[in-house]
């Protein structure tokens, strides 16, 4: 067949030009399928752009559409593959914002790939000129897609069985200063914190392998500290060894060395490291019996602005699919951003198996995790012993309460700082189990415990005036 004949035949069923997105991608009569991936976008259109057109543009640009009609549309079934905006909902109190609900057929996404999922949903559309701002508020991941992911390497119950600790939150500490310590001094700080009563210590997010402390030296000194602390206390101890590196090959080499040293847990910066690297590491951890702690470094660049970016509840869901046993979630009461209701919403999305839609907590869709293991929430950032009652009340048992400055800043040193936190935690758990109200009686509970612990009394005196009372930027 000649070129001229081909050109004539395509003309018969094809009309070139630009048409409104809403003619194809706005389908208010559509009923989402159980297998659809559903997305809730907060859309701020440019002045003069109708809501239906802006919403349809998001559906088009995040699925099959482009700016003009193309004749190759005739070579596929667009009705099968296109994203569809099926509902629009105004945002209360905002004149020019609305929530666009979009359904995507499952065929658009590669199985087991968070990287491909996000590349489609948020990879290009956020730069679209017709929009002033765009934020992905929530996703509903269907069971059919979830079953293509391994998820967390182990999950909450398996972790507790590995470390033999039940009925209370776990205690951690980020070693400070985060940069500048030699490997030997770093190991010393780890040992002091663990023998003082903590369950875990932690590399900070930006400790990798710098001139003042190469990764192999740090791993060796930390391993010595853990083995010594375990022998002295009779408890399983751990340190989150950060294996994040410049290449996946180097990252896996560091993970393998941690396993060789019989370390129970390693760590990854999942956003700066990337989802492909994180998923690979999670698979390695399951195969080799390592727990995987996840740091969310860079998250606020993506999630803090209320009208643009990706909400952390979406990043949390993506992390649970990609794989991690812990992830930092904020504290509500500490120095980092976090509205209480929203924080509790995405903590449930990390830990629970089935979560009902609850708009007061920012949950737009009911999510069934199909028995995928849960992720333990990590409360970290500006917390100290006076926060302990609120933290136990807010987070419950399946969490790691991580006191960095709140341990290492103790006036008597690292080990007494760890002891102060352990005593405060044990006092709060006992009081809760006896039926006392931690939010109302928390101060009294801590003061009573000070009578039996000079380490706790010294910590309480030091931090009695320290508060972080700022209004949350991101609210429902």
Curated annotation (Swiss-Prot):
GO cellular component terms listed in the entry, alphabetical order: carboxysome
Taxonomic superkingdom: Bacteria
UniProt enzyme class: lyase
Cofactor note as given: Binds 1 Mg(2+) ion per subunit.
Enzyme Commission (EC) number: 4.1.1.39
Ranges that cross the membrane: none
Name the record gives this protein: Ribulose bisphosphate carboxylase large chain
Native organism taxonomy: Bacteria, Bacillati, Cyanobacteriota, Cyanophyceae, Gomontiellales
């Amino acid at each position: 067949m000649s070129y001229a004949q081909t050109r004539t035949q395509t003309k018969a069923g094809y009309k070139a030009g630009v048409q409104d997105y809403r003619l194809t991608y706005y389908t208010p009569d559509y009923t989402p399928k159980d297998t659809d991936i559903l997305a809730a976008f907060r859309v701020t259109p440019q002045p003069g752009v109708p809501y239906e057109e802006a919403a349809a543009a998001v559906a088009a640009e995040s699925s099959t559409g482009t700016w003009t009609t193309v004749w190759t549309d005739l070579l596929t079934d667009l009705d099968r593959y296109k994203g569809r905006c099926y509902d629009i909902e105004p945002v209360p109190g905002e004149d020019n914002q609305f929530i666009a609900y979009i359904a995507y057929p499952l065929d658009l996404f590669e199985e087991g790939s968070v990287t491909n999922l996000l590349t489609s949903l948020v990879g290009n559309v956020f730069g679209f000129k017709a929009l002033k701002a765009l934020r992905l508020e929530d996703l509903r991941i269907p069971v059919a897609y979830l079953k293509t992911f391994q998820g967390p390497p182990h999950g909450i119950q398996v972790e507790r069985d590995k470390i033999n600790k039940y009925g209370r939150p776990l205690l951690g500490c980020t070693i400070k200063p985060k940069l500048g310590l030699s490997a030997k001094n770093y190991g010393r700080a780890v040992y002091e914190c663990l023998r003082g009563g903590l369950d875990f210590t932690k590399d900070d997010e930006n400790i990798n392998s710098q001139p003042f402390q190469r990764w192999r030296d740090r791993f060796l000194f930390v391993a010595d500290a853990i083995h010594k602390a375990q022998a002295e206390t009779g408890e399983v101890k751990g340190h989150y060894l950060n294996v994040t590196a410049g290449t996946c090959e180097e990252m896996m080499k560091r993970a393998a060395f941690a396993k060789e040293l019989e370390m129970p847990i390693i760590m990854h910066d999942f956003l700066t490291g990337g989802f492909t690297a994180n998923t690979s590491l999670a698979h390695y951890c399951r195969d080799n019996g390592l727990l995987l702690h996840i740091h969310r470094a860079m998250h606020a660049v993506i999630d803090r602005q209320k009208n643009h970016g990706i909400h952390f509840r979406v990043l949390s869901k993506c992390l649970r699919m990609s794989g991690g046993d812990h992830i930092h979630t904020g504290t509500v009461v500490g120095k980092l951003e976090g509205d209480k209701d929203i924080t509790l919403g995405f903590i449930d999305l990390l830990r629970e198996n089935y979560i009902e839609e609850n708009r007061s907590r920012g949950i737009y869709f009911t999510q069934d995790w199909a028995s995928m293991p849960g992720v333990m929430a990590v409360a970290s950032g500006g917390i100290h012993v006076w926060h302990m009652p609120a933290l136990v009340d807010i987070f419950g048992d399946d969490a790691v309460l991580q006191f960095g400055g709140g341990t290492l800043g103790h006036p008597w040193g690292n080990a007494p700082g760890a002891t102060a936190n352990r005593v405060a935690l044990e006092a709060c758990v006992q009081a809760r189990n006896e039926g006392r109200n931690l939010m109302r009686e928390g101060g009294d509970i801590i003061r009573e415990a000070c009578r039996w612990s000079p380490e706790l009394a010294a910590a309480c005196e030091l931090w009695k005036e320290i508060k972080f009372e700022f209004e949350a930027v991101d609210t429902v």
